[in-house]
């Protein structure tokens, strides 16, 4: 399963609203667009048009990750996810796991502490240890759905990211690149040192030349 940024946002919103506002679920295109563009609890904040959300829905429908629903007497089409915990889904998750995956889809990589703080409307974790236990289970599945990122400089906790979206792959690649300097960067550093040494030698020569001229000037005046 590989989701684009827009698809991941749509799935995350459907997962979230199913739990937090069940009376409004499934969601219409308009309601889903508003959910995708929320200014809070979203990272990054997006400004998707209804057309962009519809494109994401069409793509997810082809992947059989969402379904459409029309009520009697209503022409408004509403959408619900088939991402997990349905008879059509291979992915079966606990409510705790759904909360963690949902938050990672909506807000990107996070620490266990951040996940516990932000999950209160989705699941009531007793403490960070419970979050960490759930994360461990998700990482030890036959098909892991989470991965741990290298610890950031100056931070005590590692962050975790989901493995469903393209964004998570980019984050992982960036983290690994930052954690392990490449041969190209080492080569560039060596080149910079050579240029710096050449510049220093040039400046030393200019200083010596100016010193000689100054001494000659002083000698001519005395």
Swiss-Prot record:
Coiled coil: none annotated. SUPFAM superfamilies: Winged helix' DNA-binding domain. Disulfide bonds: none annotated. It comes from the Bacteria. Residues 169-195 are annotated as: Disordered. Residues 169-193 have a biased composition (Polar residues). InterPro entries: DUF480, WH-like_DNA-bd_sf, WH_DNA-bd_sf. It holds the Pfam family DUF480. Belongs to the UPF0502 family. This is UPF0502 protein SO_1867.
């Amino acid at each position: 399963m590989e989701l684009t940024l827009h698809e991941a946002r749509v799935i995350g919103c459907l997962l979230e609203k199913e739990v937090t506002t069940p009376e409004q679920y499934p969601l219409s295109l308009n309601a889903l667009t508003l959910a995708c563009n929320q200014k809070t609890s979203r990272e990054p904040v997006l400004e998707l048009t209804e057309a962009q959300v519809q494109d994401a829905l069409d793509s997810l429908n082809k992947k059989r990750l969402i379904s459409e629903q029309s009520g009697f007497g209503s022409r408004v089409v509403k959408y619900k996810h088939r991402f997990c915990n349905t008879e059509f889904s291979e992915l079966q998750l606990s409510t705790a796991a759904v909360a963690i995956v949902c938050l990672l889809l909506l807000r990107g990589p996070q620490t266990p502490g951040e996940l516990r703080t932000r999950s209160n409307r989705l699941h009531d974790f007793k403490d960070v240890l419970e979050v960490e236990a759930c994360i461990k289970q998700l990482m030890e599945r036959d098909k892991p759905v989470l991965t741990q990122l290298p610890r950031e400089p100056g931070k005590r906790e590692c962050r975790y990211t989901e493995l469903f979206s393209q964004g998570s792959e980019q984050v992982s690649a960036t983290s690994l690149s930052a954690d392990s300097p490449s041969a190209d960067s080492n080569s560039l550093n060596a080149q910079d040192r050579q240029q710096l040494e050449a510049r220093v030698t040039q400046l030393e020569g200019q200083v010596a030349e100016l010193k000689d001229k100054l001494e000659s000037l002083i000698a001519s005046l005395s």
